Amino acid sequence: MSVDLGIDLGTASVLVYVKGKGVVLKEPSVVAFDRDSNVIKAIGEDARLMLGRTPGNIVAVRPLRQGVISDYTVTEKMIKYFVQKALGKRLFKKPRISICVPSGVTEVEKKAVEEATFAAGAREVHLIEEPVAAAIGAGIDISKPCGNMIVDIGGGTVSYTHLRAH
């Protein structure tokens, strides 16, 4: 049986959608790690609680800036953690993952998201521009021949798109 996930990888938070179950996870995009050993100490809400409250060797960071990856390795580990947390122990087959990217990002930035998602354990990766994902999430049929203005306000970006099917 195939497992399909949708991930909104945001600057401020990550949402994970599991087909047939809906949104199963919403956590901050924060990772805490030991600067000396490079060992991850916490991810998500647990790491957010550590922001500004850690000893000098523990650093809590947000690995995305303005919707794009600023720390590839940390982002990969964060994606892997959230996928495993969303699916629990039932991960027999690698999931297919559709993951959002801001509109207007470069091909290099798109490739980084795709590679990090594959490295995190995906068997297939589909990149979806955030405004298109927002439209689908809002119940808009993007295949209908009518225009829609979509404004996506995120933690690190604001984007707008005019969607029109032909």
Task: Give the positions of each predicted feature.
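Nucleotide/phosphate-binding catalytic cleft detector across ATP-hydrolyzing
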Residues: 1-155, 163
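Positively charged, low-complexity, intrinsically disordered RNA-binding extensions
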Residues: 159
